Amino acid sequence: MLEQCLALDERVRVIRLPVNVGTYGARNRAFDEATGDFITFLDSDDWAHPRRLEKQVQPLLSEDSLVATTCQALRVTEMLELTEPGRSPFTLGPASLMFRKDAALARLGYIDPIRGSADNEYLRRMIAVFGDNSLLRLRERLVVYRQRRGSLSRADFRGSLWIHPARYAYRSAYTLYHEDIRAGRTEPYLPKNPVHRQFPAPSHLVRADRAPASAEYDVVFAGDWRRFHGVQREMVEEMQMLSRQGLRVGVLQMATFRWMTSERLWVCLPVQRLINRGSVSYCLSTDQTSSALVLIRDPSILQFPRHQPPGVTAKLTAIVASEAPSALDGSDSRYVPQACTAAARELFGAPTVWIPQDQKVRHALEMSGLSQPELASFELPGVIDPREWRVERTGFRADVPVVGRHSRDSSTAWPRERETLFQVYPDSSDTDIRVLGGARSALEILGDAALPSNWLVYDYDEIDVRSFLYQLDFWVYFSDPAEGEALNREVLEALASGCVVILPHRFEETFGDAALYRHPTEVKETVQTYHRQRALFLAQSRRGRARVIELFDPSTYLKQTSTLLERSSPATGPQNEPAGVLPAGTGSQTSSEDGIEERSRSRT
């Protein structure tokens, strides 16, 4: 057939490669061989409408500002059947991409030479460089995209939601890479045979001769990394600290059913940045890795675990409980310790130990039936680097006190009564109230159509926590007394940033004189008193920061983690790269459209 094609037109050339370099390797060779102004592709098992080239090139000839065009493609089986319920048969993906050769090669370079999803990465990199308006998406259906049974591109997608974890990891990694391109923090050019990668690539998508060896970790942090709330911020501090100590650290994605969503969310920005830098590694549930210790700070991820094994075997699993199994009155059931213990043993194949964050959580775990040795004799309150959170304070932010709080938005995270809520967060022009994390639950408690005009509310992903705390003078947290939540992380962040912290008396056992403790009726007067006396305010601000350094010294955490590692058999052998990911900084074939719509990433 190829010989017949040669006879069709003198401009047709057949280029035979001595070895199989995969689809993207072949396309990269075609980039070098092409002599025309435009490049497009057609796989051997696909079909193009006779007027496809005409329809796609016409806008490029007419509009100099356009860099590329695509058209609608129809997904079918080898027998031209539509047999994927729940997934649209039409796609506007890279299978039909046509672009200006010189502009693309000069700025973008080549396609990532892996086995799948790289054509999507190239298309999105093109948009990151040239802008959204540089691509024209034709609505006409000019390509039939056939997917063979058992092919990589077909097996890696199920319905409209499930994608292979390797493709998820790859997409999450290159999405951050593209954000850095837009911000001017990195270069978009990829050479044909890269010596160093710009972002990690999972071994599932890497050619067999370039896949990394199996990995062994010292500590794997398991959690729901799609959001960046208090428990994730806590674990990020911990994994950075352990990584700086030379330990091999991995992260494992496990969704919690408490915060399920049909929206596809990528790995949150701070964690993905650590992965892209190579500070930590992303563990794929489809690969087999081992770790001396698996550390979990959100037990709810174990309450209803996925039936698929996580791919990590451990010597010891530590479940750090940052909150009680339920609210004090039995409502807001979060997890059942015995069920979580059984799930952890089945998933990771290792003994399990529970470690409370503080004495209140210890008491709740004991009431649930846990005891030593299953319940550790020490607490693990977490760590914070005061240098990262320090905010220079010489006075007040405004003429009126700025009072704020950051936490998850739930009914138990706010005072139960309208009167109490307004005592703590007044509806008054003499106080500026700011909230990070949303206030829909507060609005429901108030029963009003809108929040007070002196309230400024940010969604959780709208601003990073440090920038939010920079705005505040006072950090005040009052909730439903039945909540029973430790809230250590948020309090530590507020103290480390120099806010004067005001809490209910139940927190005094944990934070001592680092904070002020008041009844709700005393909060407004306390705020006004400290705002009138600058020296009094600054003294309490400095005291809070000093106590954070004293009471939450990172060396204590390192010592306790070392104790846990001693209880397990340490990972042995040289520092191997993770089995799931070929990291950034190493060199690196093939399917087309990954069928993933653009979705969001938690940033704060």
Predicted feature descriptions by range:
Residues 476-492, 504-513:
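Nucleotide-sugar-dependent
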Residues 292, 470-484, 499:
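Acidic donor-binding loop of glycosyltransferase active sites
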